[in-house]
């Protein structure tokens, strides 16, 4: 994976939609199962465009990934039509504000509660971004049960492998080995214990998605769906395999004016993922990171070790979970979730 690839990047991709909504309406109309996800940047900075799209484009459902700061500015008639809201929050107030700025945690939780009060009854997913200041186990426990807003669904993503020159500036190896990996095992134990004691499968997406595959004995492609089930539309109409690949011209897969959403080229992960022993269980960690290879082999292998640790912890717990299903303490259907909804599953 040691590489320093050059990519043709279009730095002139506009900040906001530069095409007529009718063009998007026609494109999406070719797929009767289309799901639209508002993604950024921060999509709530383009509220008028969100309104226009929801008013005119016929999609099976609408979802959004947002920092949550402007959620109160979109009228309930639109918010309540969203199926899933992914909101960026990293754990406790102290940790979230450390990463995102003073007052962010309080504003986000207030906006979430207001949305629910105004009639939103879809799924709200806490989307955590993890760096070395995060202790994942206590922060997930906090998000699940706290006096501000207790989340029913949580996902987390490691901020690792996305930048070229940050690895040597960070205590990433120490954090992985001393904090993150041990706490993932602790979290898995808590997750299964909750099934045993409460008969409840908590919607912790990285655990939920992989455990379902283990139970069904199925292998998976890239679990977020990027490049083969999910595609992103740039503000200039070009179609890319992953929203993180904005402006990467070598990976433009079409244009909404003349492409068909069900006939787009598929892009899959390559090495080092394709020779990995757990590829079928993992599916690949991130298409953008796999293609750009910002970190060295040695550095990125630590990221892969976090995935192997997560998968191994779930495999270790698999017999207990099967027993709980056999004894009807929980059901296999408790692991059902909407796939390819922009939740990466693999952190």
Regions found by a protein language model. Give the residues of each.
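N-terminal pre-triad scaffold of radical SAM enzymes
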Residues: 1, 33-37, 237, 276
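Short, compositionally biased "basic patch" segments
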Residues: 1-6, 11-23, 82-84, 88
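Short acidic/His/Gly/Ser-rich catalytic and metal-binding motifs that mark active-site loops
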Residues: 1-5, 94, 162-167, 285
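Radical SAM enzyme [4Fe-4S]-AdoMet core and its adjacent flexible, acidic
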Residues: 6-9, 18, 102-109, 113, ...
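Radical SAM/AdoMet-radical enzyme domain recognition
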Residues: 21-37, 46-159, 173
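C-terminal accessory region of radical SAM enzymes
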Residues: 178-214, 238-290, 320
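Radical SAM enzyme core and accessory elements
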Residues: 236, 271-347
